Structure formats: structure tokens, C-alpha cells
Amino acid sequence: MGSKSNNNKKIILISGPTASGKSKLSVLLAKKINGEIINADSMQIYKEISILSSRPKITDLKKVKHHLYGFQSVNSKFSVGQWLKKVKKCAINIIKKGKVPILVGGTGLYFKAVTSGLSRIPKISNNKREAVKKIYDKIGYKKFYKKLISSDPLCKNKILASDTQRVLRAFEVKRFTKKSIYEWAKNTKSDFKEYDVRKIYLNIPREKLLIKINDRTKKILADQKCLKEVKNFLNLNIIKSLPANKIIGITEIKSFFEGRQTYKQLIENVNIKTRQYAKRQSTWSRGHMTDWVRVYSDKSSNLFKKILKEVS
């Protein structure tokens, strides 16, 4: 936790695995401490995907001011650096109003950018980046990943072969700066060093989380508006490498539309993907959020009291 002396510059971070109840708790907290919520989920930034990405409900948006939700087009990339810049501006404006910024989400890289800062990697031209992408497209992701690990062994076990965006970024950084992306990451500092940053992680037991995931998946997929928004998204036919394609459920619903799986299989496959994602989030938190306060209680009222105690 940050120093308690900077009460007028307090920022609260709330993270946890998907479906752990972050959004609901953050709204309760914001109402209690006069706060405003800032999105820290990389899939909830998109305008076109609201229901499938579990963006806050309209009722919650009316209760508390929310920032950085549904503002970005799925047709373009949006980097961690761009997000951080917007967050800093948002946080400053919220504090100026005498309120408390509450960052809520499950994207580990977003929170790492807030707590540790971003590396100052020299700009790499679009021509060079496109040249790297051509190599990737030509040889495929498996061979390209081997090429990355060969040139930059520090990436092994840190970047998944299937994470196209990060694989390409790591490769181009190593090739054109002669330094690993992880060497650059060593020389970073947080833009929020002068703030009182409180870090809360919702540490929900796995068996309870799986029930929550299952319930949420059924509810989302039963909503015809969800299927309609995915249909509209697919009609945009965006470039495959764009991050929005990785929103859980897109591929599965597409397969359902094409008659390649039943509705029952759709629910099960989305559940599997969501459980896998939750596991990755938990693994990330154990490695990168070691100084975060982990809270949990079976009773939501007790959980809220624990969080309130940590941020007061």
C-alpha cells in the first residue's frame, strides 16, 4: 500500500479474475467514498462490444461516473501507453474535483503500467513494423515464436506463442533496438509515484469463481442483444491480428452461427475459455502483484467492509 499521508492524492486499484465481482464492489465503494471509476480492462474499451465484454450496466453508470469504457473502435489498436496517458489525465481531473479515482479491471499489464511505469523504447517506424508482420504472416506463428525465443531468450515463458500482438512487439524491439523488451522494462518508473496508491486484489476461491463464471456465461449468451452485437462485429470483418478478435466468445459465437456447434456446446466452450483466462489472471497476480492486499469473504457485506478498511 502507498503512504497514508497523501490522502488528497489517493488512487485505488481493484483487480481480480474475471467474474469475481469487481464492478459491483467498485460501484459500492465509489458511492461510499465519493469516487469515480476508471476502466482497467483492455476488452471493455471497445464501442462495438458491450454485453460480451461485460461492460458496466446502465444502472451502474447512472449511479457513479465511469471513464474509459466503450470509447475505442475495434478497427484500431490501442496501446498500454495510450491507455496510461488517458488514465493519468482522468485521475488528475477526478482528484481536482475532490473525488477519488478507482481503477477497476482485470488487465494485468494496465495495472503494471500504473504501478511500475512503462519502458521508454525508441519509436519503431511503421515500415519496419510492417516488415516484421510480413515475416510473421509468411512463416506462421509457431515458427515465428521459435525465431523470437532464439533472438530473445528472455521472452521464453513470459509471452505466449498465441499472443500475436506481444510476440510481434517483442520481436521488433529486439531486432531494431538490439535490446530485449524486458531489458527496457528494467529502467521504468511510475507516473503515480507521488500518489497514495492502494492496491486491492479480489482473491475469490477457484471453486466459487467457476460457479460465478458459469452463471455469467449463461446469462450473457441468453441475451439476444449479445448475439446481435457479435453478428454486427463479425460483419465489420476487421483484420485478424487486431486485439478485439480475442474477446472471449467471438470465435465461439461465430462457430455457432455457422452451425459448427450447438448452443449447449457454445456455452461450454465459452466457459472453458473464460476459466482458462481466469487461471492466467490468477497466475499473473501471483507473479506481478505480490504487494497487493488480497481480500475475500463469503458475505459481500463483509468483503466490502474489508475493502473499505484497506482504502480508508
Task: Give residue ranges: language-model regions.
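Phosphate/pyrophosphate-binding catalytic cores of soluble transferases and nucleic-acid-acting enzymes
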Residues: 1-312
